[in-house]
């Protein structure tokens, strides 16, 4: 019996895969050549003008004031163990989950879920408690470095982005449900809300909220005071703040343990519903955990927090927590603008669910609220999540418009540093790197959630 001869080898440059690799290598080489040439050219031109290059200027004294200052935790050596324990806890939980999934051909049960929660939260919390003295709280001042100024501005940007994403999602959901309402007045009001906000530039809306709304509030002496709990004037919104006492650590740990217990109960209830058709009890046991554990911590350590009320001293209020008009205008403007787009995305996702699903749920005597929460929205999420990623990214990028209304975000403070130091290339590079990281984090998180809610085919 004659042996079959092996097929002749195809040259690398003639196979599709080989040509693809060659093309990618050539393009990458050309890109690196252009980038290195541009970098050398920039260094030469900077040297001719007597401008130093590099990031050493970040340690220089800033010398300017930032209107929105946050307390920044400055980690020391021991905090590295916190990061190690966090990564180790997540890795252990992932290994346990993968092992049980392969062994049982299904998700883990409630007991192993509790163990994973305990490991993933317990290890970092224990490490943080052991090295609690290795964290120094610092606040920016005019004598601080450029690095601390950028850190403060970055926190301001992240704060606006997070609150804007949450607020625009909640507001968009409410408007979407209003657009689908059988009530003629509510439906048309929501429709005009969407049409108006989608077709007005976001910068114009920021100007409206800042100059027309928040700058027209009364002066400090004529503030709107609601029992000392809420004070509103031209300089901002003031509310009481919580001041942690000696028992705050145990109280917060008890609250976290109660939340983890509720998650375990929800997991157990879902498993019972899948196995028997009857969900387990969650409300009363969860309420008991949420009340009993923090109450015990309160009784053991005493009052965990005290209230610091804002008090008028001189020409402004001191104490409590204050929200500046710039911050309020930026958050409200971005939230209202993006909520119009989110409303249409959510509405299209709800309408993408087959009408038979709603009719079948009603045939089971489910209330309209249950139909929306249990049947419609879970199926609509796989349509809603992908386009919502773009809207969240838009909030992060549009937050750079804060410079127009005087809010000290990352771009605004970076521009001030650029004008003082003249390090344009370095500052622009920092801008690009930070916003790229923020976008990748948002995109990665939404892609992870999209994989969780996608339709699983058998």
Predicted regions and their residues:
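Transmembrane alpha-helices and adjacent helix-loop boundaries
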Residues: 2-458
């Amino acid at each position: 019996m004659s042996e079959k001869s092996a097929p002749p080898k195809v040259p690398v440059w003639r196979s599709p895969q080989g040509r693809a690799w060659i093309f990618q290598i050539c393009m990458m080489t050309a890109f690196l050549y252009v980038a290195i040439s541009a970098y050398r050219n920039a260094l030469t031109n900077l040297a001719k003008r007597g401008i130093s290059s590099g990031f050493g200027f970040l340690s220089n004294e800033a010398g300017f004031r930032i209107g929105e200052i946050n307390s920044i935790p400055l980690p020391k050596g021991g905090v590295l163990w916190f990061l190690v324990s966090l990564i180790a806890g997540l890795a252990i939980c992932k290994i346990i989950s993968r092992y049980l999934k392969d062994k049982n051909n299904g998700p883990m049960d409630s007991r192993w879920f509790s163990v994973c929660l305990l490991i993933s939260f317990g290890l970092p919390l224990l490490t943080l408690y052991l090295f609690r003295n290795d964290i120094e709280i610092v606040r920016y001042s005019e004598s601080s470095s450029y690095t601390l100024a950028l850190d403060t501005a970055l926190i301001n940007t992240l704060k606006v982005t997070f609150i804007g994403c949450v607020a625009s999602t909640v507001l968009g959901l409410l408007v979407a449900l209003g657009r689908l309402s059988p009530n003629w007045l509510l439906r048309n009001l929501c429709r005009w809300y969407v049409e108006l906000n989608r077709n007005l530039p976001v910068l114009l809306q920021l100007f409206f909220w800042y100059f027309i709304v928040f700058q027209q509030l009364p002066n400090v002496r004529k503030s709107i005071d609601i029992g000392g709990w809420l004070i509103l004037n031209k300089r901002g919104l003031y509310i009481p703040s919580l001041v942690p006492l000696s028992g705050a650590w145990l109280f917060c740990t008890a609250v976290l343990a109660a939340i983890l217990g509720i998650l375990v109960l929800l997991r157990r209830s879902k498993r019972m519903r899948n196995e028997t058709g009857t969900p387990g009890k969650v409300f009363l046991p969860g309420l008991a955990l949420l009340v009993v554990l923090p109450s015990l911590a309160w009784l053991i350590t005493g009052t965990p927090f005290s209230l610091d009320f804002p008090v008028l001293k001189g020409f402004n209020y001191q104490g409590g927590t204050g929200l500046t008009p710039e911050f309020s205008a930026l958050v409200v403007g971005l939230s209202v603008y993006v909520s119009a787009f989110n409303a249409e995305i959510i509405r299209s996702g709800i309408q993408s669910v087959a009408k038979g699903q709603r009719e079948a749920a009603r045939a089971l005597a489910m209330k309209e609220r249950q139909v929306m929460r249990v049947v419609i929205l879970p199926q609509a999420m796989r349509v809603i999540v992908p386009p919502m990623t773009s809207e969240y990214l838009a909030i992060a990028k549009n937050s750079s418009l804060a410079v127009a209304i005087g809010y000290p975000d990352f771009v605004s403070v970076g521009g001030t540093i650029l004008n003082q130091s003249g390090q344009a290339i370095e500052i622009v590079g920092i801008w690009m790197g930070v916003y790229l990281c923020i976008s990748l984090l948002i995109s990665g998180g939404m892609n992870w959630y999209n994989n969780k809610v996608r339709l699983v085919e058998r």
